[in-house]
Amino acid sequence: MALTLTDVTRIAHLARLEMADADAERTLTQLNEFFGLVEQMQAVDTTGIAPLAHPIEQILEVAQRLREDAVTEHVNRDDNQRPAPAVQDGLYLVPKVIE
């Protein structure tokens, strides 16, 4: 998958980003290099290889000490929404930004 300069300028326009031509060309190069890397990774046959949660453990003798994922405090929705300018039925109301 390769992007064109038109794609980059269109995406910038949709994201409401001002982008000079030189920046758009540099971004195009970087994005195409990134997509090339993704295509290389997708081409690798990983059949029969177990996914790794912590790949660093395979090359370094280090144990990742992770805390147990447990709820330590409860969230009170009303307290969190009190400072919001507009709330309805427990949801934050925001201005429409998509045309």
UniProtKB/Swiss-Prot annotation:
UniProt enzyme class: ligase
Gene3D superfamilies cross-referenced by the UniProt entry: Glu-tRNAGln amidotransferase C subunit, N-terminal domain (1.10.20.60)
Catalytic activity: L-glutamyl-tRNA(Gln) + L-glutamine + ATP + H2O = L-glutaminyl-tRNA(Gln) + L-glutamate + ADP + phosphate + H(+); L-aspartyl-tRNA(Asn) + L-glutamine + ATP + H2O = L-asparaginyl-tRNA(Asn) + L-glutamate + ADP + phosphate + 2 H(+)
Top-level taxon: Bacteria
Pfam families: GatC (PF02686)
Alphabetical keyword list: ATP-binding, Ligase, Nucleotide-binding, Protein biosynthesis
GO molecular function, one term: ATP binding
GO BP, sorted A to Z: glutaminyl-tRNAGln biosynthesis via transamidation; regulation of translational fidelity; translation
Enzyme Commission number(s): 6.3.5.-
Annotated family: Belongs to the GatC family.
Complex formation: Heterotrimer of A, B and C subunits.
Functional summary from the UniProt entry: Allows the formation of correctly charged Asn-tRNA(Asn) or Gln-tRNA(Gln) through the transamidation of misacylated Asp-tRNA(Asn) or Glu-tRNA(Gln) in organisms which lack either or both of asparaginyl-tRNA or glutaminyl-tRNA synthetases. The reaction takes place in the presence of glutamine and ATP through an activated phospho-Asp-tRNA(Asn) or phospho-Glu-tRNA(Gln).
Protein name in UniProt: Aspartyl/glutamyl-tRNA(Asn/Gln) amidotransferase subunit C
